[in-house]
Amino acid sequence: MAGCLRHFTSVGDDTKKKAWKEEDVEVAHEEEPKNTPHPFIASYSFRGALKWLFSSHKFQIVIICLVILDALFVLVEVLLDLELLAEKVDHIIPEIFHYLSISVLSFFILEIAGKLYAFRLEFFHHKFEVFDAAIVVISFIIDIVYISREDIFNAVGLLILLRLWRVARIVNGIIVSVKTQAEDKIHRLKENQESLLEKVAHLEQQCAQQEQEIVRLQTLLQQHNVFPAS
């Protein structure tokens, strides 16, 4: 199941995994906290800043909200077009929702362009990301080409509603990312625990050697009558 879920990951998950692996779990010796710059500022490049933005969970949540909002716009427009919400509605109302949907799609187009610029070939390594981009581009083209058609949603309403699948992909991507982060931290904690156990065993050995040395020195002192035996 985990192998299937990994196909739903978004671009940038590999970058986040590397970042998590670089986190040090310091228990033996603590260091003074350092003032580290924000990842967006520390990227030192526009492409790096875009990678951080597209990989952040807050951005994924914004995308989920926009996808749901866009689907609601489309659903309302379909219902208005089929005259299910009201028998008579102003002709301008469906157009308003249509343009609202186009505005959200325009943001998705910019998102795809930004991902292509930031991740380049890595973008095409995620099949569902490519499929998602194809759905958005096709929906955007259809909306623009048939912008004056009143019966557009009778034919392509379901196609546009397919964008709802992005919610499942993004949510699954977040789940897989959190799971991977937890597994990596557990692995590092286990390694750190083994290291600490080795240090404890080494310290116990040193203590035993010191106790033996103390006994030897006490015996030597007693032999030279430095102090009487207890």
Swiss-Prot record:
Subcellular location: Membrane; Cell membrane
Pfam families: Ion_trans (PF00520)
Residues in coiled coil: 177-226
Extracellular side: 80-96, 149-155
Major location category of this protein: membrane
GO molecular function: voltage-gated proton channel activity
Gene3D superfamilies in the record: 1.20.5.170, Voltage-gated potassium channels. Chain C (1.20.120.350)
GO biological process: cellular response to pH; cellular response to zinc ion; proton transmembrane transport
Transmembrane regions listed in the UniProt entry: 59-79, 97-119, 128-148, 156-176
Cytoplasmic side: 1-58, 120-127, 177-230
Entry keyword set: Cell membrane, Coiled coil, Ion channel, Ion transport, Membrane, Transmembrane, Transmembrane helix, Transport, Voltage-gated channel
Topology with respect to the bilayer: Multi-pass membrane protein
Highest taxon of the lineage: Eukaryota
GO cellular component entries: monoatomic ion channel complex; plasma membrane
InterPro entries, per database record: Hvcn1 (IPR031846), Ion_trans_dom (IPR005821), Volt_channel_dom_sf (IPR027359)
PANTHER family in the cross-refs: F20B24.22, VOLTAGE-GATED HYDROGEN CHANNEL 1
Subunit text: Homodimer.
Domain notes: The segment S4 is probably the voltage-sensor and is characterized by a series of positively charged amino acids at every third position. Unlike other voltage-gated ion channels it lacks the pore domain. The C-terminal coiled coil region mediates homodimerization. It is essential for normal subcellular localization.
Described purpose of this protein according to its UniProt entry: Mediates the voltage-dependent proton permeability of excitable membranes. Forms a proton-selective channel through which protons may pass in accordance with their electrochemical gradient.
Family: Belongs to the hydrogen channel family.
Protein name: Voltage-gated hydrogen channel 1
